[in-house]
């Protein structure tokens, strides 16, 4: 039975022995919301699956992961087996094909298990979506299956030391030279850096100013000219600056 606000507060005033804290507790309990209200049976199942994974595979290990300051690769691969590595990507190369609401249900529940790991999973999914939406067929075929399964981790590289996350002001540049782009610049606060093997890097094409000059290339760990500077501890997870110095990337990586 729902207890009205006026009745609860009147009861508090009439009975001096009853504290207002208790009245507020009763009011909050009366108006609690079931997080599955309004969801379809399929969405409720998605929610239950993610919640069970968060409680059983993530929450018991929070302290250990925070102390190690590393992403739990074994648990991420279990998440990949459930389809959490490419939530809103096409099933063609391992994506789950969920819509944004369904994906939000998953990430919301995972956050109840470990917010740091869930935050990284959301970033990994951003990388998967960008590659699935804008990558060439060759790139999608070569990289999406391993990203979807978490066999390969992805990092989204936008933020820079001088411009923050203002995409229109970024300075990392790519200049055409023959069949390659020559990339120079730096990135900061890159989640997953050091454990990721695939980096979606936003950069400026041929020095073209403004937002229309921004495009993205896939950079793989180990490429000559790509280096990790150092890891930094943050409130949610760890992140690292990256340096790109005369990094050569084949032009076929751009979608044409």
Please state what every model-predicted region is.
Residues 172-175:
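A structural signal for short hydrophobic beta-strand segments in well-ordered beta-sheet cores
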Residues 97-106, 166-170, 251-252:
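Structural signature of FAD isoalloxazine-binding scaffolds in flavoprotein oxidoreductases
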Residues 1-33:
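N-terminal mitochondrial targeting presequence
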Residues 163-166, 181:
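Hydrophobic, small-residue-rich alpha-helical packing segments that form membrane-like cores
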Residues 224-254:
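Flexible, small-/acidic-enriched active-site or ligand-binding loops
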